[in-house]
Regions:
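N-terminal auxiliary segments of SAM/dcSAM-dependent transferases
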Residues: 1-13
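S-adenosylmethionine/decaboxylated-SAM
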Residues: 12-36, 45-232
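Short helix-coil-helix linker/hinge
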Residues: 40-41
């Protein structure tokens, strides 16, 4: 005989789901603890869950602009891995677009001077090492080029999830969006990192959201990550 749901059983079921989600979050966070970067774990978890939500958006690729040492790449690729584990289907790959020579702030004397950039001039070897340690190599395809160069070789395939985290200037954010968002179909998502923490990114995103054409709307976010869904 089927039991009637009560407030108590509903609360217990809700908490059970919450705890299961927390376990997934914590396991992923610990898996990527070896990768340095400026992505808050809550932001990474949101990216991971978006990448795994294939039933909630159109078919297409996952593309990130700006990969640095691979932290966001790991979160995104882990979402694809969960799709493969859950369905057995080919989940595709994360296309990691980056020249790997760092943004202006990572150079010697920059606001966020990075030892790897200063010493080796590239984070690509460390990026590959980090992806390999996370067991995600088969789910990541490196596109070693600047964003505006890489888009020239893009196949034209739809992009269901686009993550923009490259050069944080207003002009670069605007240009990255203009170059890549045209491949995002209605129902697809574009994510911006460092909203409300970097002036250039913030200014562009505010302009985009105020655009009368309303091609994108804000649907969720975490820390400095803003998620916009294409509606037109």
């Amino acid at each position: 005989m089927q039991q009637t749901a009560t407030p108590r059983t509903q609360a217990e079921e809700f908490l059970t789901r919450e705890m299961a989600t927390l376990v997934i979050y914590e396991q992923a966070r610990q898996s990527f603890a070896h990768v340095s970067g400026w992505l808050h774990p809550a932001e990474g978890f949101l990216l991971m869950r978006l990448a795994s939500a294939t039933n909630a958006m159109p078919a297409g690729a996952v593309v990130e602009i700006g990969s640095f040492k691979g932290l966001s790449t790991c979160w995104l690729a882990s979402g694809l891995r969960s799709v493969r584990s859950r369905t057995g289907a080919d989940a595709g790959k994360v296309f990691a677009v980056d020249h790997f020579t760092g943004s202006p702030e990572h150079q010697a004397g920059g606001k966020f001077e990075d030892a790897e950039i200063v010493k080796h001039g590239s984070t690509l070897p460390l990026f590959r090492e980090n992806i390999q340690k996370a067991g995600l190599t088969d789910l990541v395809e490196v596109v070693q080029a600047g964003s505006l160069e890489a888009v020239k070789t893009w196949s034209g395939a739809p992009i269901r999830l686009l993550f923009i985290d490259g050069d944080h200037s207003y002009e670069a954010t605007r240009d990255d969006f203009a170059a890549w968002s045209k491949f995002v179909p209605v129902g697809g998502y574009t994510c911006f990192h460092d909203v409300n923490t970097w002036e250039g990114v913030t200014r562009f995103v505010k302009e985009l959201m105020a655009d009368p054409s309303r091609r994108f709307i804000t649907v969720m976010g975490a820390a400095s990550l803003l998620v916009a869904r294409r509606i037109a």
